[in-house]
A protein has these predicted regions:
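Charged, low-complexity interaction regions
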Residues: 15-22
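Histidine-centered divalent-metal-coordination microenvironment in nucleic-acid enzymes
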Residues: 106, 136-152, 224-230
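Aromatic/basic-lined ligand-recognition segments
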Residues: 56, 97, 155-235
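Flexible helix-coil linker/hinge segments at domain or subdomain boundaries
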Residues: 136, 169-183, 253-279
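Beta-strand-rich recognition/accessory modules
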Residues: 212, 223-262
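Helical (often loop-to-helix) elements that flank the catalytic cores of nucleotide-handling enzymes
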Residues: 69, 116-127, 150-176, 237-252, ...
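Terminal catalytic/cofactor-binding subdomain
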Residues: 29, 33-133
Length: 291
């Protein structure tokens, strides 16, 4: 009898008839942290609402500490300055150091876990505070988006990477040149990797050499129960950030039931976008084509 994968065993616990408390204890015994178990069970409890999801953003930028602290208070944005860490939280935006950012006053603004049902307002307030504080971005800064994905099966998880690979050439058209192809060592292309034989998370991890520095990070699932999208250039513009968050969330949702069989040839052919969203990304592609 074939040994069940990690994802299959987690799914078995999650879908059992036991109480939520019993499921949490079982997940912790299985090796997950209390936080990871909470995320998995939270996603399970809201999955009946197909449009609901959790997300988080990491905004790399340059901004003076004292100024942004004052502006955060004005916009009622809870913040905390911390050293470099990967701890998740549900209550405040944390500012951490990031050695990859070049320039004066480099910082990474990491959001708390946000919900699609209300989280965008909190994100907009944070962007307003950053912009009022004079935050700037450059070629060394990026925007990382995490989408809650703890309820994905192995097949669905693989689909996210395969589908992004099928979309990557089109996504490159509405990204800055510094984030296209493999122009950035912190978000390398997926196009050179063979994913066709992947069946679960561990197969994908092996293909990517267990490195997180790809346009889609295969390592964040184990640590956070998320899929991390790393390609977007640095930005403090709420519209650009929120549209990319929604793109990533829709890609994850699409991947639950679909695997693209060939490369997508244009933005207008991306199957999960609305006409309004296609218009936005076409506008971004035109901007980069002319600059």
């Amino acid at each position: 009898m074939a040994t069940k994968s990690f994802t299959e065993q987690v799914e078995e616990i999650k879908n059992s008839s036991a109480s939520v408390a019993s499921k949490k204890r079982a997940l912790i015994r299985f090796g997950l942290t209390s936080y990871e178990a909470d995320i998995i069970l939270k996603d399970f409890n809201i999955k009946a609402d197909s449009d609901a999801y959790t997300f988080g953003v990491e905004i790399e930028c340059l901004v003076q500490r004292g100024v942004v602290t004052a502006k955060a208070r004005e916009f009622s944005v809870p913040i905390s300055y911390e050293g470099y860490n990967h701890r998740d939280n549900k209550h405040y935006f944390k500012f951490v150091s990031d050695a990859s950012i070049r320039g004066e006053n480099p910082i990474e603004c990491v959001s708390p876990i946000l919900s699609s049902k209300g989280g965008f307002e909190k994100l907009e307030n944070c962007c307003n505070a950053l912009n009022e504080a004079g935050a700037a971005v450059n070629k060394s800064t990026g925007l990382h988006v995490h989408i809650g994905a703890a309820n994905l099966s192995g097949w669905q998880y693989c689909n996210v990477f395969i589908n992004y690979q099928r979309l990557e050439k089109i996504i490159d058209t509405f990204m800055a040149a510094s984030r296209r192809e493999s122009n950035n060592i912190y978000c390398k292309t997926l196009l050179n990797e063979c994913l066709a034989n992947c069946d679960d998370m561990y197969d994908v991890l092996d293909v990517f050499g267990r490195s997180r520095y790809y346009k889609v990070n295969p390592c964040s699932y184990m640590r956070h129960g998320t899929i991390e999208f790393r390609q977007h250039q640095g930005s403090t513009d709420f519209e650009k950030i929120s549209m990319w968050v929604k793109f990533c969330a829709k890609l994850v949702k699409f991947s639950k039931n679909n695997r693209l069989q060939e490369d997508v040839s244009s933005i207008n052919d991306i199957p999960f976008l609305t006409q309004k969203e296609k218009a936005f990304f076409n506008k971004r592609a035109n901007h980069f084509a002319n600059n």
